[in-house]
From Swiss-Prot:
Coiled-coil segments: none
Top-tier EC class: isomerase
Domain of life assignment: Bacteria
Protein name per UniProt: tRNA pseudouridine synthase B
EC number: 5.4.99.25
Listed GO biological process terms: mRNA pseudouridine synthesis; tRNA pseudouridine synthesis
UniProt key word Ribosomal protein: no
Location of the active site: D38
Species for this entry: Clostridium botulinum (strain Langeland / NCTC 10281 / Type F)
Organism taxonomic ancestry: Bacteria, Bacillati, Bacillota, Clostridia, Eubacteriales
Length: 289
C-alpha cells in the first residue's frame, strides 16, 4: 500500500493523531504527514503511506492555501485564541485601514516564527522552551505570500484566504498584522483549503475511512507529485538511470531546464522517480520505483 491520502483533519486533534489513526486503519507503520496543522486548525492534511513517505519533503515544498479568521484587539502568548491573554485594546480602525495593512503582506516577507511552534533551535523544540517560560530570539525566515483575498471585515473579526509558501506561520502573520495596526491580533480559526496538489473538496474525513475502503482513497505517488513537470525517457535509458548513471544524451538534455526536478517516466507510463539536470547531465534524484 503506497501512496497519499488527502485527509480532512478535524479540529481538536494533532497531526500525529491522524498519522496514528491511519496506521491502525492501514495496518502499516510507514506513515507520515506532510506539514503540521495545529490542533486548533482543520482542513487538508496529506498523509503518506509506504514508499510515499519518501516524498514527504517534496509535497511540503508545494504552496498552501488557508482560510483565516483573525480577531483584532487581543494579543496572546501563542498568537492564537488558546493562549494566555497578554493585552486587550479597543479598536479604532476602519475596514479600509485593515484591508490596506493586510494587503501589504503580499510578496516576499521576513517572518519570525512563534515561540509556540515545533521548530527546533539547537535541538530543542520551541514550544518545549515556551512551556517552561523561556523565550529565545528567533531569526526571521524568508517566506512568500502569493495572494490574500479578504472575504469579510466585521470588526474585531476579519476573514481572509491566503496562499503562501512552505514555512509560513499563519499565527505569526496575524500577530504581525495586529502589531502593524497597533491593535494586536490573534488567529481565531484556521482551515487549510489546499496543500498543493490536494484540496479540501476531495479530502476524506477520518471517520469515513476503514480497512475495507482505504485503498480507494489512495493517490498514487506520481499523481501526488503532479506539480512537478513530466519527463518521458526512451526505454533504452531505463537501466542506466535506474543504476544511477548520469545521462549526457543531447536528446534528453536539450529539452529540460537545469536544476529543476522532473517527474520522470520510462516510455510515458512507467514512473521511476524525480530526476534533475545539472552541469554534468541528467540523473535520477529520488528513485521511487
Amino acid at each position: 500500500m503506497d501512496g497519499v491520502i488527502n485527509v480532512l483533519k478535524p479540529k481538536g486533534i494533532t497531526s500525529f493523531d491522524v498519522v496514528r489513526d491511519i496506521r491502525k486503519i492501514a495496518k502499516i507503520k510507514k506513515v507520515g504527514h506532510t506539514g503540521t496543522l495545529d490542533p486548533l486548525a482543520s482542513g487538508v492534511l496529506p498523509i503518506c503511506i509506504g514508499k510515499a513517505t519518501k516524498i514527504v519533503d517534496y509535497i511540503m515544498e508545494g504552496t498552501k492555501t488557508y482560510r483565516v479568521e483573525m480577531k483584532l484587539g487581543t494579543t496572546t502568548d501563542t498568537y492564537d485564541r488558546e493562549g494566555t491573554v497578554l493585552e486587550e485594546k479597543e479598536i479604532n480602525l476602519t475596514p479600509i485601514e485593515v484591508e490596506k495593512t493586510i494587503k501589504k503582506y503580499i510578496g516576499d516577507i521576513d517572518q519570525v516564527p512563534p515561540m509556540y511552534s515545533a521548530l527546533k533551535i539547537n535541538g530543542q523544540k520551541l514550544y518545549d522552551l515556551a512551556r517552561k517560560g523561556i523565550e529565545i530570539e528567533r531569526e526571521a525566515r524568508k517566506i512568500h505570500i502569493y495572494d490574500i483575498c479578504i472575504l469579510s471585515i466585521d470588526l474585531p473579526y476579519v476573514i481572509f484566504d491566503v496562499k503562501c509558501s512552505k514555512g509560513t506561520y499563519i499565527r505569526s502573520l496575524c500577530f504581525d498584522i495586529g502589531k502593524d495596526l497597533d491593535s494586536g491580533a490573534v488567529m481565531w480559526n484556521l482551515q487549510r483549503l489546499e496543500a498543493s496538489p490536494f484540496n479540501i473538496k476531495e479530502a476524506i474525513k477520518l471517520e469515513d475511512l476503514n480497512e475495507e475502503n482505504i485503498k480507494q482513497y489512495i493517490t498514487p505517488i506520481d499523481e501526488a507529485l503532479k506539480d512537478y513537470e513530466k519527463l518521458s525517457l526512451d526505454k533504452k535509458f531505463e537501466k542506466l538511470v535506474l543504476n544511477g548513471v548520469v545521462l549526457k544524451d543531447r536528446r534528453v538534455l536539450d529539452n529540460i531546464e537545469e536544476n529543476k526536478l522532473y517527474r520522470t517516466y520510462i516510455e510515458d507510463d512507467s514512473f521511476i522517480g524525480l530526476g534533475m539536470k545539472n552541469a554534468y547531465g541528467f540523473k535520477i534524484h529520488k528513485l521511487l520505483t
